[in-house]
Amino acid sequence: MNALAGRRIAKVSGTPGKTRMLNVFEMPAYYLLDLPGYGYAKASHTDRHAFRHLIRHVIDRPRLTGVLWLLDIRREPSDDDRAMQELFAERETPVLAALTKSDTLARAARARRAAELRSALDLEEDQMVVTSAREKEGIVELREAIAGLIQPRTA
């Protein structure tokens, strides 16, 4: 999110799954909501259930324009990822998947993993952007894709 904003708006932890509450960031043309991770978070069963409830509540909001779904390109989709994709499809929620941490893979492996994830999660090519915050890869493309996602709502 910091790379997307072009400045430090979110605290970054070295440990995945540290987000425990809804964080809202005002961007120039939209609001970005950072939700707790539903799958990788090292949280109690009760907390994970509460995270899922919060996510469903946000997805059901009528003003929701779309979801920016951050997925680690190195990891296989979890059962939780598949359940979220089913929820997005069921609710007809527009989805844009940002495949993060691409700098950890060779270029050929990035393309292969993107294709595998696209297939596994039943996404279209224009619903995915390969990104690396460290290398600033895909950030411009991600901003453009977000603009395309919110354009119908703001036009």
Stretch-by-stretch model annotation:
Residues D34, T100, S132:
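Active-site glycine-centered loops adjacent to acidic/histidine catalytic or metal-binding residues
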Residues H53-D126:
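Conserved C-terminal guanine-recognition region of P-loop GTPase G domains, centered on the G4
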Residues M1-K42, T46, Q151-R153:
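Conserved G1/Walker A P-loop phosphate-binding module
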Residues T19, R48-R52, S78, K136-I139:
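Amphipathic alpha-helical transducer elements in NTP-driven molecular machines
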Residues R20-M27, R52-D60:
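Conserved alpha-helical scaffold flanking the Walker A/P-loop in AAA+ ATPase domains
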Residues Y38-R48, R74, D103-A106:
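Flexible beta-alpha connector loops of hexameric P-loop NTPases
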Residues T104-A155:
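Canonical P-loop GTPase G-domain recognition
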Residues N2, H45-R48, R82-E86, A111-A114, ...:
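Short, glycine/charged-enriched secondary-structure capping and boundary segments
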